[in-house]
């Protein structure tokens, strides 16, 4: 059993993302995880500072001086780094992490970690295009953080090919794509019931309503007994815009947060990813939720996302034939694609990502993790 210290800009209670998935992957492999959550503003006192969330998982909370998107000047980076570094040092004194713990860093601005862990293996995972997300009219302050963080790391991973290419100017990053947290499950082969297209994600302004409405129009004309289901929670205030955008369309239903297995999987013909073009979407190579959908045997219909991985069962809604050709493709090939989907899920099992990260399962968990292959 080994110890892993994870640094993130995420609360453990948030919707699961790659930070949570890596933590769970390590826990299931029999290791201990110390999960440093997103720092609170300096005027707040996070409580408890250290919390045993469950066996093997310790949540650790710190504070910072400035939000990572707002450090416009290098001295602001220095001041914040000194403050956060002191916070981390104090928290480590009350944690029982081993001195040789492996560090997995998801914070693009924690370039100071080498001062804290001089001899440790530090793995940095860049999971977003932070420069594109800059809240200021320039991104040089973010590039400064990224460069220094990459250069101090033992290894760097990127979650998409565009991010991987961006980071090459400072390091030799490897590609870390999402993996399937559950094994492939063959869908019921009753095609007569499959008349439902499902979007399962955040229902907000990231959805391209023009694409959704084109699908709705096509179904109304060509497949009047088919429906669209938009399922998920909302970040911010974008839900009302979605509701307004699909109002009056009888073949579209919007639901709140629902677990995937609570949906009528035997009625779903394909999953939807109808996203708007944006810097964040343009850099996506494989979305986290996609692997969960593939594990249930569902093909995927996507729009925009030019860097998305190419597979026969990932069909573009903005391709040559438009939404009609995409819908026809999943209707004609759903069963024929299952062997390819099953193989893709197996090739992206948890054990493959452990090996990529250079992590061995603890002896007590080795059989369970290897068995997932």
Please report, for each region that a protein language model flagged, where it lies by residue.
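A short, histidine- and acid-enriched strand-loop-helix "catalytic/donor-clamping" loop
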Residues: 12, 111, 126-138
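Nucleotide-sugar-dependent
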Residues: 13-17, 207, 262-266, 273-294, ...
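Membrane-proximal helix-turn-helix segments that form the acceptor-binding/catalytic region
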Residues: 22, 86-94, 129, 136-156
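Carbohydrate-associated surface elements
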Residues: 162, 177-181
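A charged, aromatic-enriched C-terminal amphipathic alpha-helix characteristic of glycosyltransferases
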Residues: 178, 332-371
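Conserved donor-binding/catalytic core segment of Leloir-type glycosyltransferases
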Residues: 189-207, 212-218, 229-231
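Nucleotide-activated donor-binding/catalytic signature segment of Leloir-type glycosyltransferases, i.e.
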Residues: 232, 239-262, 269
């Amino acid at each position: 059993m080994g110890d892993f210290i994870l640094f993130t800009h995420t609360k453990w209670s948030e919707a699961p993302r790659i930070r949570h998935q890596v933590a769970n992957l390590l826990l299931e492999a029999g290791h201990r995880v110390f999960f440093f959550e997103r720092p609170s503003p300096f005027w707040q006192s996070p409580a408890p500072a250290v919390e045993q969330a469950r066996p093997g998982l310790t949540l650790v909370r710190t504070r910072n001086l400035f939000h990572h998107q707002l450090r416009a000047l290098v001295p602001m980076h220095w001041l914040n780094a000194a403050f956060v570094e002191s916070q981390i040092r104090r928290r480590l004194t009350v944690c029982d992490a081993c001195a040789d713990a492996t560090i997995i860093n998801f914070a693009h601005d924690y370039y100071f970690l080498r001062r804290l862990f001089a001899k440790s293996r530090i793995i940095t995972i860049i999971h977003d295009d932070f420069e594109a997300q800059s809240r200021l009219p320039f991104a040089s302050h973010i590039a400064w953080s990224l460069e220094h963080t990459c250069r101090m790391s033992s290894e760097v991973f990127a979650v998409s090919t565009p991010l991987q290419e961006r980071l090459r100017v400072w390091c030799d990053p490897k590609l870390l794509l999402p993996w399937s947290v559950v094994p492939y499950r063959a869908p019921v082969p009753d095609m007569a019931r499959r008349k439902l297209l499902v979007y399962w994600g955040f229902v907000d302004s990231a959805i391209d309503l023009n694409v959704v409405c084109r699908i709705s129009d096509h179904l109304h004309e060509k497949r009047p007994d088919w429906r669209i289901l938009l399922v998920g929670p909302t970040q911010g205030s974008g839900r009302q815009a979605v509701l307004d955008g699909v109002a009056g369309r009888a073949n579209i239903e919007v639901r709140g947060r629902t677990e995937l297995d609570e949906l009528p999987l035997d009625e779903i013909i394909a999953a939807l990813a109808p996203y708007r073009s944006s810097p964040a979407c343009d850099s996506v190579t494989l979305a986290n939720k996609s692997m969960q959908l593939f594990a249930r045997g569902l093909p995927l219909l996507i729009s925009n996302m030019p860097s998305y991985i190419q597979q026969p069962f990932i069909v573009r809604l903005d391709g040559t034939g438009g939404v009609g050709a995409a819908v026809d493709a999943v209707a004609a090939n759903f069963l024929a694609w299952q062997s390819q989907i099953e193989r893709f899920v197996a090739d992206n099992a948890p054990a493959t990502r452990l090996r990529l990260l250079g992590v061995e399962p603890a002896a007590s968990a080795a059989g369970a993790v290897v068995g997932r292959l």
